[in-house]
Amino acid sequence: KYLETRMIDGEERWFRKTISNFALLNKDVYPAEIVQGKKKEYAKVHPMCEHILTQKLEENNTCDWKKVNATFYIEVPADAVPAGETIKAWLPYPFDNGRQRNFLLLSSSSQAIHSSGSLHHTVYMEQKAVKGQPTRFEMKFSYEVGAQVFHQADILKNLKSYDKQSDLYKKFTAQELPHMLVNKQMKTLAQKIVGAETNPVLQASLIYDWISANYPWAGAIDYSTIPCIPQYVLDINHGDCGQVTLLYISLLRSLGI
């Protein structure tokens, strides 16, 4: 399960992060110099986390705002599309919410059309393919990002009963295949994890802790190649942050959370 392979055009191909994943998932043989290097990286982050965690939580509060400049691009290899044909690209673009604001598109490689009003905001661009040349779509943008802290005690204090007949509740506790799985296996596993606990906030914490203890982080193969991500995590015993999040969501929804 550490060494992920795929048969592609009759050839066995190894996932490019196989070696690093093997090290991450086998602590006994993890090179000491890598462990020390990781500790140094984490040490740089800890003071920032401690500063944010000391902020007092108030309703909708966001603290420690930082301005970020970003460059995002995608490049289509030369001659992947016949010369003269139009290549259309949709690049992901952030949008305002509680933790990010003041987005500004600074530049783009071609005319950009920004979508809004959907869950997935994008910038649309198109270019003609040129023989022998790669086609690059690029945009530069800036925005501000802030931190929010949610303490369990505050969440428990403000907890209200669910309206289980509401469309909102039904929507966010429903199965959404292929990657939000609510079936007998998930329900049984979720109930086993939480035991006799009935408070949904504490149930969510128990499930979070269980996943953290049992499914270590490792680099992920492309999500589009995985038929059902939460089941994949259960089968392979590891996952990256997005993969274990989908397992977490599936287990919560299985309990009606």
Which residue ranges define each predicted feature?
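Intrinsically disordered, low-complexity N-terminal segments that are enriched in acidic
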Residues: 1-150, 154-156
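Active-site-proximal structural scaffolding
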Residues: 82, 132, 200, 204, ...
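Acidic low-complexity segments
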Residues: 116-122, 126-235
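Cysteine-centered nucleophilic/redox motifs
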Residues: 89, 207, 234-257
